[in-house]
Amino acid sequence: MSRIGKKPVPVPQGVTANVDGQVVTAKGPKGELKFVVNDDVLVKLEDGAIAVDPRNESKMARSKWGMSRTQIANILTGVKDGFEKRLEINGVGYRAAMQGKNLQLSLGFSHDVSYEPPTGITITVPKPTEIVVSGIDKQVVGQVAAEIRKYRGPEPYKGKGVKYAGETIVRKEGKKK
């Protein structure tokens, strides 16, 4: 039994939600998002909340139940408040800057790395060692942050590279003589 799936998702103030068959649409101040729910899950909009139930008691239906509820909650939060991921850059000479819409990264390569964000994603650089990725779709925001981090992930000896804000890097001891 899914403990997450049992709770209906309340529709926040300022957000209009619509359920059309298996498609949940949310429209809010930040934009509009759609989510197609798996066929094993039944979705209903009743008195200001979206209820999610499994169609049958199969293992597949129960496994999709809680995930579908969380995805719906994420699109409702996204169109109201949006999501953001913060990245930090550590290392001598490692820095980030915006060049038009593109993110320019100096990460110790022989060339600068240029990253063009997908539509709906905003990248800002408050400091040369800090990157903020924001948007309304939680999955896309996390994917963009992961792609930027992948260019130069943090290494365990000195901690140089791109890491998520608040991420702790397990440090290793160097060679001993």
From Swiss-Prot:
PANTHER family: 60S/50S RIBOSOMAL PROTEIN L6/L9 (PTHR11655), LARGE RIBOSOMAL SUBUNIT PROTEIN UL6M (PTHR11655:SF14). It comes from Chelativorans sp. (strain BNC1). Belongs to the universal ribosomal protein uL6 family. Pfam families: Ribosomal_L6. It comes from the Bacteria. GO terms for cellular component: cytosolic large ribosomal subunit. This is Large ribosomal subunit protein uL6. GO terms for molecular function: rRNA binding; structural constituent of ribosome. Part of the 50S ribosomal subunit.
